[in-house]
Design a protein with these regions (language model features):
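Glycine-rich, mobile lid/loop segments that gate access to catalytic sites or pores
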Residues: 1-75, 82, 87-94
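Terminal-appendage/accessory-domain detector
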Residues: 54, 58-71, 78-331
Length: 331
């Protein structure tokens, strides 16, 4: 995505997921260079995904899109392992990826954190985003600002102050507005997938509840009249001074106006979990405990955490898989 973003061309970013997953699978399967090349050819030719997944009212498919790409990437690696070839040159060809999907781009040689050559690109895992809140990433700073302002407003004006707000203004930047603050459906979400990709919903939920969790998107919350009333007061506006700051920062300026004319403002530039404001190891562990223990139990989660912290010493990735298995439960 850093070399050639796909969103503006109408393609979904998971298109790259099939290729990156293929490379991970190729390494795990110990494919030769020739086999890996064919695996990439197969993954790229067959897995171009439409951006419609993330526009307007969103469906359950949003949560499946990348996992589907990863599954197809693994399949491409297995096919290449067994001798199947794919069309080439897949990127520079007459009807290839660059001509029809991404546009031209160049990649630096992959290096790593100890690479001696400064021209080599570091491993991108060091630049990964981790979500602190269960909302679309561009909404992370908005939720953080909303929670801080909620405490400030209630302390100053009383417990019912949030319901007495007259206007909620979310100042943001072009990419964020396009993804989660433009479509009319963002003000009237009827699915979890639309709600967690909605500036109005995420901010309103944070202001009303004082927290944003997975339960913030339960069906009964999507129908909550108080939430819908608060969303009507939300305006999303571009902030010219934010132009060009993403992805180094993801700024949100949240302004609340009360019926008495008092104005409260909070700006958050870099969310917790961003490479510029990383979560601690303890934060990441606690997130896994909170989310996974409901499905696999806390004891299994603790074993998983211990295993992952020593993963580089393991000889076979297959030993990880049983720790990810959800126990069967009788109906």
């Amino acid at each position: 995505c850093d070399a050639a973003a796909l969103r503006s061309r109408g393609w979904d970013h998971v298109t790259y997921g099939s290729i990156s997953s293929t490379l991970g699978a190729a390494k795990t399967l110990k494919l030769t260079e020739a086999q890996t090349t064919q695996a990439i050819n197969l993954a790229a030719v067959a897995n171009v995904a439409l951006r419609q997944t993330r526009v307007g009212e969103m469906s359950m498919w949003k949560a499946c899109a990348f996992s589907n790409a990863a599954r197809n990437g693994l399949f491409a690696a297995i096919l290449a392992q067994r001798g199947m070839t794919g069309p080439a040159p897949i990127f520079e060809g007459e009807k290839g990826f660059m001509k029809l999907v991404s546009g031209p781009f160049e990649l630096s040689r992959l290096g790593g954190e100890r690479a001696p050559d400064d021209t080599l690109a570091s491993f991108k895992i060091l630049d990964s985003y981790i979500k602190h809140f269960p909302v679309e990433y561009h909404a992370q700073t908005a939720v953080e600002a909303a929670l801080a302002l909620r405490a400030e407003v209630i302390k100053a004006e009383g417990a019912d102050a949030i319901q007495r707000l007259s206007e909620i203004e979310i100042g943001s930047y072009d990419v964020a507005i396009e993804i989660i603050g433009r479509d009319p459906e963002k003000w009237h979400p009827t699915t979890r997938e639309t709600a967690d990709h909605s500036f109005p919903y995420c901010v309103a939920a944070a202001l009303l509840d004082g927290r944003v969790t997975l339960h913030s998107f339960d069906p009964h919350r999507l129908r909550d009249a108080a939430l819908h009333e608060l969303m009507k007061k939300v305006r999303v506006v571009p902030q010219p001074e934010f132009a060009g700051r993403y992805p180094g920062a993801m700024p949100t300026r949240l302004t609340l106006r009360t019926t008495t004319g008092t104005v409260y403002m909070r700006q958050v530039d870099v969310p917790l979990g961003h490479p510029g404001n990383p979560m601690s190891d303890q934060d990441v562990e606690d997130k896994l405990r909170r989310l996974a223990s409901r499905r696999i139990g806390l004891a299994q989660v603790e074993k998983l955490i211990g295993f992952v912290w020593t993963l580089e010493r393991e000889k076979d990735i297959a030993t990880l898989m049983p720790l990810l298995r959800v126990p069967h439960r009788d109906a």
